[in-house]
């Protein structure tokens, strides 16, 4: 006689967790958007920041002729196969990730060496919030190259918090740093270069422009420009 087995039904309802109750992994950009108002208000509570200007910095000719050398805690690397000279702080101040935010500085081609001389004290400053930057070796680019007529300097911004987030203090320092770069160039009457079509900038920036390289491309478009102008990082720099 067959054994009658009890009818067992597994209740799956208890295993189905409502999706909205699961903390979703937000992107760094979404987190920055969510914290925008808080950061905006915190930034405005900080006083003006004054950067100590580095002394004994190299000239543009020095870094063009060097292969690998250390200046003011920055390793300068100039490979013959690269049109850029790279600078990277040996002991980074920002320990977070690079999430695509960067600035370009565009200078008239013939004034790039002079612009470097004007900005080098800030770029090599121990107070600089920029751990990594690069500059075009003008001897290696054509007359009409994108990084010859503009965008000769690139400043890479790294986050300093968990989940690739920026602290209000770092954002404040970056804002102030960009203002100092702009004012030094303007005061020295340096001629601006052609800023990249891929970037955005407010009307009062004459040399510096912004781009997030993870959410844009070099070609640029109206749609990309609008998107970049809505980037929370960019808005926190200009508003």
Curated annotation (Swiss-Prot):
Annotated Gene Ontology cellular component terms: extracellular region
Residues annotated as catalytic: 104, 134
Outcome of swapping residue 127 to A: No change in Erk2 phosphothreonine lyase activity
GO molecular function: lyase activity
Induction: Transcriptionally activated by MxiE in the intracellular environment of the host, in association with IpgC, under conditions of deregulated or active secretion. Expressed in a VirB-dependent but MxiE-independent way under conditions of non-secretion.
Top-level taxon of origin: Bacteria
Protein family membership: Belongs to the phosphothreonine lyase family.
The protein, known as: Phosphothreonine lyase OspF
Organism field: Shigella flexneri
